[in-house]
Amino acid sequence: MAVGGQKKVTKGGKKGGKKKTADPFSKKEWYDIKAPAMFPKRTCARTLVTRTQGTRIASEALKGRVVTLSLGDLSEKNEEVFRKFKLQIEDVQGRHCLTNFHGLELTRDKLCSVVVKWRSTIEAHVDVKTTDGYLLRFFIITFTPSVPRSERLHSYAQTTRIKRIRARLVEIIQQEVSTCDLKEVVNKLIPDSIAQDARKAASWIYPLGETFIRKVKVLKRPKADLARLMELHGESKSTAPGETVSRPDHYEPPKVDSV
């Protein structure tokens, strides 16, 4: 007695056979990312995007993309690798993506290495508007230094002094940023001069140790302007003024018989 039914024999194996897998990178192309003129290294990275197909345009897909690069990649200085700059693509010209400043942040390992026990950690944040219409939020962090040759293990600051230090830090950031445009602000963020000026101004309240601008966020930006972006990249086209020609009223150009 048969236990199972006889299997149907098909010719040529499974239906359809094995499908060929296409290489996903065959439909993509590379674009160079150009940093603003404030950074020493302009062409700093490359990015992939799907090629233009139908109504999907590659340049439009790139606009708004945010890339994160360390200051070491933007300036070729290995001691600045713990500071990350965020750049946003605002325009595409050929195979070059023109970017604008989008934020700043310290790496996680650097932030953990500067936090030490038995010392006061003082943090503050403030929203400042630049002269060209950018609303930025600054986060600053500082610490009280360890006292050498002291019987006490800790060097905590009093709460009243911490409040005064925090207010002084906020005041210095507002003074440094509110009178500058975005280009000048980025030029101050690259050497971290804002944090050092704030530390010097607040040290008379209580001695301070390492001070950093921990994070910068762009909360609001003005309407996109290609001329401003080209000026930020140092590629603004200067048009030479033309010479004015005086002509009488009701002037008509002469007729040309042949062209």
UniProtKB/Swiss-Prot annotation:
It is found in: Cytoplasm. Keywords: Cytoplasm, Ribonucleoprotein, Ribosomal protein. Belongs to the eukaryotic ribosomal protein eS1 family. It holds the Pfam family Ribosomal_S3Ae. HAMAP family: Ribosomal_eS1_euk. Residues 1-23, 235-259 are annotated as: Disordered. Residues 246-259 have a biased composition (Basic and acidic residues). Component of the small ribosomal subunit. Mature ribosomes consist of a small (40S) and a large (60S) subunit. The 40S subunit contains about 33 different proteins and 1 molecule of RNA (18S). The 60S subunit contains about 49 different proteins and 3 molecules of RNA (28S, 5.8S and 5S). Residues 8-19 have a biased composition (Basic residues). This is Small ribosomal subunit protein eS1. GO terms for molecular function: structural constituent of ribosome. One of its GO terms (cellular component) is cytosolic small ribosomal subunit. GO terms for biological process: translation.
